[in-house]
Amino acid sequence: MWTTVMQAFPRHTINRAVIVLLPKQPALDWIKSIDPSPANLTLGELRQEPDAFLVRDERMEFPEDAERWVHRRWKMFFEMFIADWYIDESLWPQKRTLKMFKDWFEIQYHPMVWDLSDGPIVNEDWD
């Protein structure tokens, strides 16, 4: 049965790993403190559609490697998340630190990325 299922789809991996940043309760608390209109927003809902980042996989063998990689770039990830909610920088937490980042986000690392599509990968430039 497994062979039949897998033959129905193209199956190959790509040379990337995935890092997912899942917001934690302090992130939700900040969102609600700035704008009470998403009053019914729950942590579960906030975590339903997290950003996922494809990264080169050869530098990360273990989840700890991915955590170190993210921690070296924490400011960028933090600002991306905050800007997705509020562009006005005066609303952003003023004293952001690596400790705050760790309190706000859970880092998930997925080393195996399967491409089950037969269509081309298209890169969209957001600049």
Label for each model-derived stretch:
Residues W30-I31, E124-W126:
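Short, solvent-exposed polar/charged micro-motifs at secondary-structure junctions
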Residues R56-E124:
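Amphipathic protein-protein interaction modules
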Residues F9-R11, G44-E45, S90-P93, D125-W126:
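A general structural signal for short secondary-structure junctions and capping/turn motifs
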